[in-house]
């Protein structure tokens, strides 16, 4: 049983090998190599892409941290000022100058505009409007018991604001704006008549209105983008502000205004000059503030669709990246600014960078390897194909007679034995025909060997055309042929032999110019039906004996028995 399984496996492998062929195997091997090389290259591309994304995020994080650090410093100053203001509201300093300031306020509070100054070199002036103007505002009110304390606290904060404000700071203006109709600012109001306009410019700004107890329930620091309160100045500003509360009462707002141009300059200074890419700053509503690119100081390179995609991506995380056409956009929310910093890196910038050089080198290596692989495939495929053709030709020549194109003696015997064994296994008859051309030596002697070769070739063609599909014919001697008929009885084999004899004898063939001859053959037939013997050599010997009986009986005959 194990032997049968082994034979079946070998047979299956042989069939597969015949079906595939060496060329198909070469193709398959090269396809596998190409697929694996492409897979490895793709894996390298994925790793390179991850490294590129990490690099983009690291560059963005460095700039964001630098900007955040500077903004945090200003936020910390604002919190410090609010704490000082709260302390001053609860426990004001008992200075004569401060008491005089309260008295002066009581004297001028009904005036349309007023200013209180203690010492211009030490503190800032308090600028205010009348009770009548305050009463017209919805958010404004002087109905609080600590109004005097707020006046003195504003003067104290003015002293701190003067100390905190310097030319190297990002902050252009720091101010305290009270709901009670006055303000303190590091930008002085030169003329009293300008106080109402400036005050109402403050209290109508989003950074003031947005700190009402309804709008800012958590009383936290907030950032706003707005136009300045001065009509002559059209440059947008970013204002950080915080409400001032004490005993659950909202007194006013402390704020610091930072011009966008200042943030733009700081953004440029924070960027490594050797790095490509554009940095853009947006507020919480994705409104463009500034850019590090001098060519787009007030531009926006994103269309509405791209801004919508960016906003959708920002909903799920505080940092990330997204591809937009040929650009890679990375973004990170700032900790101390209600906005987001965006880095835009274009394809051309990426190609010029280190990752671009590596990508180009990787692509060229893959292309070179693939080209060499294809050339190798073509050369080896041609070599294998030529060798296969040569092998097939040599194998054919080893198994066939080149003149008659029939099997030679060795090949015929190799074919006959397994066919005889198969017929014996299935109890089918197995027959053999021996054919010998009559007077062939005379043809050679009279017309030459070339004519003899033509006769042999002509006879082989007629014999082949007379056989069944499963029959096998071969040349076993000079003018002798042998035909194997698996599954044919003695009678059927005799009929085939007679058909061969008639075809050979009926057709004339041209030997030389104006010379034709007619050939004949003597045939002997044997079959396993007679003795039950399936030995091919025995059957061939028996058929050969009957062939010579046919020659002795006068040639051009078929003998299927020793008596006929």
Curated annotation (Swiss-Prot):
What is the top-level taxon of the source organism?
Bacteria
| Positions with a binding annotation for Mg(2+) | 436, 479
E.C. number, please?
2.7.7.65
Q: In which pathway does it act?
A: Glycan metabolism; bacterial cellulose biosynthesis; Purine metabolism; 3',5'-cyclic di-GMP biosynthesis
Q: Where is the active site?
A: 479 (proton acceptor)
Swiss-Prot/TrEMBL cofactor(s): Mg(2+)
Annotated GO biological process? cell adhesion involved in single-species biofilm formation; cellulose biosynthetic process; negative regulation of bacterial-type flagellum-dependent cell motility
Transmembrane stretches, start-end: 20-40, 360-380
The residues listed in the UniProt record as binding substrate, with positions renumbered to this chain, are 444, 449, 453
Q: Which CDD domains match?
A: GGDEF
List residues of the GGDEF domain.
428-563
Which GO molecular-function terms appear in the entry?
Answer: diguanylate cyclase activity; GTP binding; metal ion binding
| Bilayer topology annotation | Multi-pass membrane protein
List the subcellular locations.
Cell inner membrane
Which leading EC class covers this enzyme? Answer: transferase
What does it catalyze?
Answer: 2 GTP = 3',3'-c-di-GMP + 2 diphosphate
Give the matching PROSITE patterns.
GGDEF
Keywords noted in UniProt: Cell inner membrane, Cell membrane, Cellulose biosynthesis, GTP-binding, Magnesium, Membrane, Metal-binding, Nucleotide-binding, Transferase, Transmembrane, Transmembrane helix
- Residues at site: Transition state stabilizer? 441
Q: Name one GO cellular component term.
A: plasma membrane
The cofactor note reads: Binds 1 Mg(2+) ion per monomer.
Q: Which InterPro entries match?
A: CHASE7, Diguanylate_Cyclase, GGDEF_dom, Nucleotide_cyclase, Rev_trsase/Diguanyl_cyclase
- Tell me the PANTHER family matching this sequence: DIGUANYLATE CYCLASE DGCQ-RELATED, REGULATORY COMPONENTS OF SENSORY TRANSDUCTION SYSTEM
UniProt function note: Catalyzes the synthesis of cyclic-di-GMP (c-di-GMP) via the condensation of 2 GTP molecules. Cyclic-di-GMP is a second messenger which controls cell surface-associated traits in bacteria. Involved in the regulation of cellulose production.
User: Subunit notes for this chain?
Assistant: Homodimer.
Protein name, entry field:
Probable diguanylate cyclase DgcQ
The root-end lineage is: Bacteria, Pseudomonadati, Pseudomonadota, Gammaproteobacteria, Enterobacterales
């Amino acid at each position: 049983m194990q032997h049968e399984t082994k034979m079946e496996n070998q047979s299956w492998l042989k069939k597969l090998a015949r079906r595939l062929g060496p060329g198909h195997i070469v193709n398959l091997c090269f396809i596998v190599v190409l697929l694996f090389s492409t897979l490895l290259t793709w894996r390298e591309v994925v790793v390179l892409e991850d490294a590129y994304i990490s690099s983009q995020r690291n560059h963005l994080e460095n700039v964001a941290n630098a900007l955040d650090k500077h903004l945090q410093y200003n936020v910390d100053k604002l919190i410090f000022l609010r704490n000082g203001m709260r302390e001053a509201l609860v426990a004001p300093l008992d200075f004569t100058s401060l008491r005089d300031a309260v008295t002066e306020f009581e004297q001028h509070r009904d005036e349309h505009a007023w200013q209180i100054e203690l010492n211009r070199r030490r503190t800032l002036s308090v600028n205010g409007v009348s009770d009548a103007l305050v009463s017209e505002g919805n958010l404004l009110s002087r109905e609080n018991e600590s109004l005097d304390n707020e006046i003195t606290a504003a003067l104290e904060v003015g002293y701190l604001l003067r100390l905190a404000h310097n030319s190297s700071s990002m902050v252009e203006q720091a101010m305290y704006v009270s709901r009670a109709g006055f303000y303190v600012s590091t930008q002085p109001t030169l003329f009293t008549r300008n106080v109402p306009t400036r005050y109402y410019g403050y209290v109508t700004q989003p950074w003031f209105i947005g700190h009402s107890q309804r709008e800012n329930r958590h009383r936290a620091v907030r950032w706003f983008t707005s136009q300045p309160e001065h009509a002559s100045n059209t440059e947008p500003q970013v204002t950080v502000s915080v409400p001032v509360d004490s005993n659950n009462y909202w007194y006013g707002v402390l704020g610091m205004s930072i011009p966008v141009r200042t943030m733009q300059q700081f953004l440029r200074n924070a960027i490594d000059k050797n790095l490509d890419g554009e940095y853009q700053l947006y507020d919480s509503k994705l409104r463009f503030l500034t850019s590090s690119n001098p060519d787009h100081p007030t531009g926006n390179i994103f269309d509405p669709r791209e801004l919508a995609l960016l906003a959708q991506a920002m909903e799920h995380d505080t940092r990330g990246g997204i591809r937009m056409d040929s650009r890679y956009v990375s973004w990170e929310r700032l900790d101390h600014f209600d906005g987001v910093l965006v880095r835009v890196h274009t394809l051309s910038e990426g190609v010029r960078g280190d990752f671009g050089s590596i990508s180009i080198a990787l692509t060229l290596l893959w292309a070179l390897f693939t080209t060499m692989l294809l050339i190798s495939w073509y050369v080896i495929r041609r070599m294998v194909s030529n060798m296969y053709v040569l092998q097939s030709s040599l194998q054919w020549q080893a198994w066939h007679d080149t003149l008659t194109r029939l099997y030679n003696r060795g090949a015929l015997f190799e074919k006959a034995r397994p066919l005889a064994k198969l017929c014996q296994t299935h109890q089918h008859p197995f027959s053999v025909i021996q054919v010998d051309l009559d007077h062939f030596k005379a043809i050679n002697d009279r017309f030459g060997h070339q004519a003899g070769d033509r006769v042999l070739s002509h006879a082989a063609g007629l014999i082949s055309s007379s056989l069944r599909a499963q029959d096998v014919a071969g040349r076993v001697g000079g003018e002798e042929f042998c035909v194997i008929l698996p599954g044919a009885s003695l009678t059927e084999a005799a009929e085939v032999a007679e058909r061969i004899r008639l075809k050979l004898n009926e057709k004339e063939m041209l030997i030389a110019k104006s010379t034709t001859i007619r050939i004949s053959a003597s045939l002997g037939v044997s079959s396993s039906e007679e003795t039950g013997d399936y030995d091919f050599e025995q059957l061939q010997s028996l058929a050969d004996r009957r062939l010579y009986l046919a020659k002795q009986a006068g040639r051009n005959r078929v003998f299927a028995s020793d008596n006929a």
